[in-house]
């Protein structure tokens, strides 16, 4: 069962008729959980219906500004993330961007879900293993170096 009913999709995604259409991009996904709520947009865990792939869907709402001049918005932020994911698509250290679409003015970025530990869980689980922490830090330094070599 989807996390949202058709009526809830209409309300939460601020749409009128598009979400109720079977062709709407959001209907390609079974929403499982809201991971994070924010005024700039939410983050959802979902499953792509066509193949069962676990995905993360990031929503960006327009007109949410980050700077005093109003020149950098939440929409710019997530579009920049999509651009970077495309530039780094052949790298093993980034997740794959699988889809992007608009519903009315909201922009959605879809990427494969990567199972693993978040930073706090990693610190807790490796608290007695300095060797693992050092190897992980070395990997992070190598990744940042590789990204910088690409001019990013």
List the model feature ranges, each with a label.
Residues 96-107:
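Short beta-strand micro-motifs within the conserved protein kinase catalytic domain, predominantly
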Residues 1-32:
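Juxta-kinase regulatory segment immediately upstream of eukaryotic protein kinase catalytic domains
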Residues 105-118:
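Conserved short submotifs of the Hanks-type protein kinase catalytic core
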Residues 83-92:
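Structural motif at the C-terminus of the N-lobe alphaC helix and the adjacent alphaC-beta4 loop
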Residues 40-79:
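ATP-binding glycine-rich loop module of kinase domains
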Residues 119-128:
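AlphaC helix of the protein kinase catalytic domain
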Residues 142-152:
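Protein kinase catalytic-loop region centered on the HRD/HxD motif
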